[in-house]
Amino acid sequence: MAKLILTHEVTGLGAAGDVVEVKDGYARNFLLPRGFALTWSKGGEKQVESIKAARVAREHASLEDAQKQAAALSAKPVKLVVKAGETGRLFGTVKQGDVADAVEAAGLGRIDKRKVELPAHIKSVGSYQANVRLHDDVAAVIELDVVAGK
């Protein structure tokens, strides 16, 4: 077993600054070559403290940014122009990436498409609501206006 200090968040393992023990092969072939971790040493405690301090500062700043962006997203509806037939039925469906692109086009900032949660498949024009997880503690509800375009 190898004792490592994580420099980045690794899903299922820990966050930056955590000290973890993993199998030698996982450390040697995945974590260390990709720069996700450093080998543990006696002087590594200083590195752990600096990484954790940077993570706390970054999380605090990202929480404030997420709250500001959530207020902006909730205040204004986002218009999605999609191809649709005469009856209002869409040619395809609205996906998370479409919502993220529409938010960016509306000037409300960039959001990750993986953070968008659609209530159901959107297959016709109309008004819908979507949830966006901007931070672990911050979620915003976006009002989507799906309209027929070219």
From Swiss-Prot:
InterPro entries: Ribosomal_bL9, Ribosomal_bL9/RNase_H1_N, Ribosomal_bL9_bac/chp, Ribosomal_bL9_C, Ribosomal_bL9_C_sf, Ribosomal_bL9_N, Ribosomal_bL9_N_sf
Alphabetized UniProt keyword annotations: Ribonucleoprotein, Ribosomal protein, RNA-binding, rRNA-binding
GO biological process terms on file: translation
Transmembrane region(s): none
Pfam families xrefs: Ribosomal_L9_C, Ribosomal_L9_N
Gene Ontology terms for molecular function: rRNA binding; structural constituent of ribosome
GO cellular component terms listed in the entry, alphabetical order: ribonucleoprotein complex; ribosome
Protein family (similarity comment): Belongs to the bacterial ribosomal protein bL9 family.
Function, in words: Binds to the 23S rRNA.
Record-given protein name: Large ribosomal subunit protein bL9
Source organism (scientific name): Arthrobacter sp. (strain FB24)
